[in-house]
Amino acid sequence: MKKFLHSLSAFLLFAASLTASLPCGAQTEVTPYRPGVTTEGITYFLPTTGLHIVVRAHRVTYAPGPYAAFAERFLEARNVEQLPTETWTLTDIDLEPFGTANREQAYTIKLNPKTSAPLVSLAPDGCLLAVNAQAPAVSALTQPSVIRSTPRTSSRSVETQEMLRAGNLRTKAELAAQEIYDLRENRNLLIKGQAEFNPKDGEQLRLMLEKIDQQETALTAMFVGTTTEDDHVFTFDYVPTKDVEADEIFRFSRHLGLVERDDLAGNPIYIEVKNQNTLPEETLDPKADKKKPTDDLRYCNPGTARIRLFTADRTFVDQMLSLAQFGRIEHLGGALFNKKFNTRVLLSPTTGHVEKLDLETQGQ
C-alpha cells in the first residue's frame, strides 16, 4: 500500500491530557475535509479491520478422447469414460487481515503556528500510518490465480496422413491403434539394438525413446482421454461488525467449485465471529477534566475476536485476531508533542493501534 507524506510548516498542538478514551463505535464529529492537509490541520481516518479470505482449490478435468468408444476393441482398455468430468477439491482456506478507512472515525490534528513541523504519513485511503516517522510498506494481499500443474497435450499433431484421410471414425481409430503398436515395437527394437537406424550414443537413444513416448502418449489419449490438473486461488473480503455464530459466506461444489451463497449445488462454508471482550472496562477519574480533548492524536486499542471458518465436518480456520471495530479509541496526549520532545509514532495499518512509540527529549 502506497503512502504519502505531508511535511508541514506549523507546530502540532494537542490537548493536555495524556490518555483518555471513548467507545470505538461512537459517532464522532467529522471535519468536512478530505484526508490530508487542510487549513485547520491534518485530517485522517482510523481503520476498520477486514478479513481477506483466501480459498485454495484443486481441479481435475477429464476430457474423453475422440476414439473412446473403440478403446476396448482396439487397445483392450476397459471402463474408459466417454463423457467429460470435472472434480473440485477444497484444499485450504486462509485469512489475511487488512485495514480499510472507517469514514465514521475521521479526525483532524489541529495545528498551531508556534509548534514544530511534523512529518505525517497517510495511506492512500487516508488512514494515519505514522507521525514523525517513515511508515513501512504494507504487505500485499494474495490475489486470485490459476496454476496448471498438468500441461495440455495435442493429439492432432501425431495423426498420420492415413488417419486424416480415413472416411469414418472407426477406421481412424483402427489406424491410430496400429500406430501405437508400431511405436511400441520400435521402442523394443531400439532398446535391443535391433532397429534399422540405431543411435550413435546413449544421449541419442534417450532422445529417440523420449520422442516415441510422447507420440504414444498423444495417440493413446485419443482413446483413453486426457486429464489436466490445476490449482485455483479465489479471494474475497469480509468485514466483521458483530458476533455471528454461523454466517454463510460461500458454497463449494465438488463438480462446480466455488459458487454463490444462494447456489444450492454447493455445500455451505460458514464463518463464526466471537468477540473475546479482552479490553478492561474503562475507569474514569472523578478528578480528571471531563472535557474530551479534540485536537490530540487518536489511535485504536483493538479488541480480540475468535474467527472460525468451517463446514459441517471440517474446520479450516480457528484463529484469534485483533479487530479495530471491537476495540475503542484512545487519545495520545498533546504533552508528548511539544517543543520539549521529539516523538515518533507508528500505527498499525490493520488495526490502528500504536505499534511503536519513541520519545526523545530535545537537546539530548
Residue map of PLM features:
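Hydrophobic helical h-region of N-terminal Sec-dependent signal peptides
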Residues: 9-18
